[in-house]
């Protein structure tokens, strides 16, 4: 599972996810990718990212390369069940990545278009966000 090795602070505030992604909205490594087109931002947990990675790499059968372009660096806390409010913030439950609309989440290279499309479709099924398959501008079929 992905998570930071060390952080400056153990817990962070929830924050708001307004607007579209300011960075990471163009392909940088591979020829194909999946982009978030959800109406508003979402948290993707490290488990969801890992499930999508496994689904894509299994279909590609170790051919080509897969890049994960998001990293779960936000700790999400939760208080235990049946505990009254107050008494401080809960313990860190899991790590999540903030994904805004327009963000490229996974990139694939070194495989044909049909293989990349199916691998990323299988990966997208594991994610709770609406996605769109994108192709690099300099790609020639």
UniProtKB/Swiss-Prot annotation:
Residues 1-29 are annotated as: Disordered. GO terms for biological process: translation. GO terms for cellular component: cytosolic large ribosomal subunit. One of its GO terms (molecular function) is tRNA binding. InterPro entries: Ribosomal_uL16 (IPR047873), Ribosomal_uL16_bact-type (IPR000114), Ribosomal_uL16_CS (IPR020798), Ribosomal_uL16_dom (IPR016180), Ribosomal_uL16_sf (IPR036920). Gene3D superfamilies: Ribosomal protein L10e/L16. Belongs to the universal ribosomal protein uL16 family. Binds 23S rRNA and is also seen to make contacts with the A and possibly P site tRNAs. This is Large ribosomal subunit protein uL16. It comes from Flavobacterium johnsoniae (strain ATCC 17061 / DSM 2064 / JCM 8514 / BCRC 14874 / CCUG 350202 / NBRC 14942 / NCIMB 11054 / UW101). The lineage of its organism: Bacteria, Pseudomonadati, Bacteroidota, Flavobacteriia, Flavobacteriales.
